Amino acid sequence: MDHNDNDLQGTNSSASLGGLDVRRRIPIKLISKQTNKTKPAPRAPRAMNRMPAKTQAGDEEEFDFNEEERYECKGGEMFGNQRRFPGPIFWDYKINLLGEKDDTPVHFCDKCGLPIKMYGRMIPCKHVFCYDCAILHEKKGDKMCPGCNEPVQRIEQCVRGSLFMCSIVQGCKRTYLSQRDLQAHINHRHMRAGKPVTRPPLEPVHPPIAPPPAEIPERFIMPPEKHHMSHIPPKQHIMMPPPPLQHVPHEHYNQPHEDIRPPPAEMSMAPPPPRPVSQDTFRISTRKHSNLITVPIQDDSNSGAREPPPPAPAPAHHHPEYQGQPVVTHPHHIMPPQQHYAPPPPPPPPISHPLQHPPQAAGTPHMVYSQAPPPPMTSAPPPITPPPGHIIAQMPPYMNHPPPGPPPPQHGGPPVNVSAPPPHHYNPNSLPQFSEDQGTLSPPFTQPGGMSPGIWPAPRGPPPPPRMQGPPAQAPLAGPHHPDQARYRPYYQ
């Protein structure tokens, strides 16, 4: 057995035994023929690598059986020799792969380019490399991520399939531990650019809707600066309720509003004055809401500046009368007519209104109240700008109702002003306050005579035709103004 072991070792380990193997093969073939059973015995050990012991110890039958095995083993050895000296291998034959596809994505390390089985995740920047590269990079003393050059606080070890990498934008490659976190990152970092685009259009949409309020705010802003009064509350009132109403009046008042703005700048303009009057009316109403009487006094100068233009559109005497009249009365007149009148009627009525309103201030406050509360009117001069919003809100209905002639006392032409509410809003005491404010507002309004009945008739006749012609309802309103004014004159006087 020892001899066999040596043979085995020799055949496996030494090349010299290879020659012996070759010699042994020859007798094996002879043995297979079974010509001489005795001769092969000595050669058998040569030809047999591991089986010689069996052949020697076993019977001939066993030897034959073993011989076949030797043959097989010999073939194996021959293949073994080929393995030792490999030749060209051909892979052009088909291979059928059995198994299921693994949906887990495989990422490649940006450092070594090999597929990552264990991730090394850079914590602050969330970029990943294979764990070996990440650790090696850290050992080098570099605390910067090799991908983004951001400082690295620590490195996390993650298993393949536990990370979700962002591939929406090339070069992002941030990784997250859940699909939800990845989606949140995409929405925040990559989809945000698109969302702003949608938002800007929305913003523009809102501005168009709010333009009427914007216009009113501009007017309000101008007077508030001058008056330093609490115009913000009136503006708020105007902004909140008026927008819908403003839209309606704007259709009629679009031009008047535009005119109103210029008139304040250009007091001499005749057409603008009526519209400024409407502004004054609005201001008064705003004051009414704010219940600030003292503030209007500061605004008187502003209101006066704007109010004088309204008389210009009215007949010439209206202007002088207005100058004589206190500014307060003029604003009052303007306030009720504009509120009751639709945007179109305001220009002519403002002229007549100043006439009517002064008498109202003196005699019957209820008349003025119909359109705007007199107390706000007295203090209205400063808040005049904010009231336009409220007045506009009221005006739209009045604009629709301009035809009614019964309220001529306020606007003469537009009977809407005739409504009883104005008296309630107006306070006789507030009228005198307006007269005081009138002096501050402007020279034309400073005159106390503004209250005189004479002023009323003058604006009724001449101003209505020019202004009223623009708005169809104004011309008829002018006529009613005179009779209504006559009725109210005794009260105001």
From Swiss-Prot:
PANTHER family according to UniProt: E3 UBIQUITIN-PROTEIN LIGASE HAKAI (PTHR13480:SF0), E3 UBIQUITIN-PROTEIN LIGASE HAKAI-RELATED (PTHR13480)
Could you describe the subunit structure of this protein?
Homodimer. Interacts with tyrosine-phosphorylated SRC substrates. Component of the WMM complex, a N6-methyltransferase complex composed of a catalytic subcomplex, named MAC, and of an associated subcomplex, named MACOM. Component of the MACOM subcomplex.
Q: Which family does it belong to?
A: Belongs to the Hakai family.
Cellular compartments annotated: Nucleus speckle; Nucleus, Nucleoplasm
Q: Where are the zinc fingers (RING-type)?
A: 109-149
**Residues annotated as region HYB domain?**
148-206
Report the pathway entry: Protein modification; protein ubiquitination
Encoded by which gene? CBLL1
Tell me which residue ranges form C2H2-type zinc fingers.
Answer: 164-190
Looking up PROSITE patterns in the UniProt record yields: ZF_RING_1, ZF_RING_2
Job description of the protein: E3 ubiquitin-protein ligase that mediates ubiquitination of several tyrosine-phosphorylated Src substrates. Associated component of the WMM complex, a complex that mediates N6-methyladenosine (m6A) methylation of RNAs, a modification that plays a role in the efficiency of mRNA splicing and RNA processing.
Catalyzed reactions: S-ubiquitinyl-[E2 ubiquitin-conjugating enzyme]-L-cysteine + [acceptor protein]-L-lysine = [E2 ubiquitin-conjugating enzyme]-L-cysteine + N(6)-ubiquitinyl-[acceptor protein]-L-lysine
Q: Which SUPFAM superfamilies match?
A: RING/U-box
Enzyme Commission number, as recorded: 2.3.2.27
Give positions of region: Disordered.
1-20, 28-61, 253-493
Per the UniProt record, the source organism is: Gallus gallus
One Gene Ontology cellular component term attached to this UniProt record is:
nucleus
Q: Where is the composition biased (Low complexity)?
A: 470-480
User: Residue ranges under compositional bias (Pro residues)?
Assistant: 262-276, 342-352, 372-389, 399-412, 459-469
Where in the sequence does UniProt note compositional bias of the Polar residues kind?
7-16, 427-444
Which domain of life does this protein belong to? Eukaryota
- The protein in question is named E3 ubiquitin-protein ligase Hakai
Give GO terms for biological process.
mRNA processing; negative regulation of cell adhesion; positive regulation of cell migration; positive regulation of endocytosis; protein ubiquitination; regulation of cell adhesion
Q: Recite the UniProt keywords alphabetically.
A: Developmental protein, Metal-binding, Nucleus, Transferase, Ubl conjugation pathway, Zinc, Zinc-finger
GO: which molecular function terms? Answer: ubiquitin protein ligase activity; ubiquitin-protein transferase activity; zinc ion binding
